[in-house]
Amino acid sequence: MPSFDVVSEVDLMEVENAFNQARKEIAQRFDFKGTHTELERDKEQNVLIRAGSEGRAEAALQVLMEKLAKRGVALESLDPQKLEPASGGHVRQLVKLKRGLKIEDARKIVAKVKESGIKVQAAIQGEAVRVTGKKRDDLQAAIHAIRAAAFPIPLQFQNFRD
């Protein structure tokens, strides 16, 4: 039976490249000179923005988002947290990277597939949703229904098998 998987993944190499490009641009741009604005990454691939003011932190976030968009990373995978005051009158902002399909989102995808009335079955398998059907056309209709639902996370369709 034909099947495919619905997953939510982020290409970490592209995130790394965009992060490095944004860090270089912030270091070189005239409007960031002397503002102590910097980008850092942690073990979980989250980005920490440190800046001298809220405006510079927001501008650094915009630079990062611009570089990510140019590299093909979906901006829905970013989860910017609230600006926090830091020592020395600076501010910091953590930007988390959403990776993997949470159970609630997977359940919503399964419910959307079932309510669409297409003759396919959807099952949650870890951090993916496996959709199986008898015809390839049914699977393509299921993909269209999932895309039309406009979920707030980036979705990819993988392992399309006949």
From Swiss-Prot:
One of its GO terms (molecular function) is nucleotide binding. The keyword Glycoprotein does not apply. Pfam families: DUF520. Nucleotide-binding protein. Coiled coil: none annotated. HAMAP family: YajQ. Gene3D superfamilies: 3.30.70.860, YajQ-like, domain 2. NCBIfam families: PRK05412.1. Belongs to the YajQ family. GO terms for cellular component: cytosol. PANTHER family: UPF0234 PROTEIN YAJQ. SUPFAM superfamilies: YajQ-like. CDD domains: YajQ_like. InterPro entries: DUF520, UPF0234-like_C, UPF0234_N, YajQ-like_sf. This is Nucleotide-binding protein A2cp1_0112. Keywords: Nucleotide-binding.
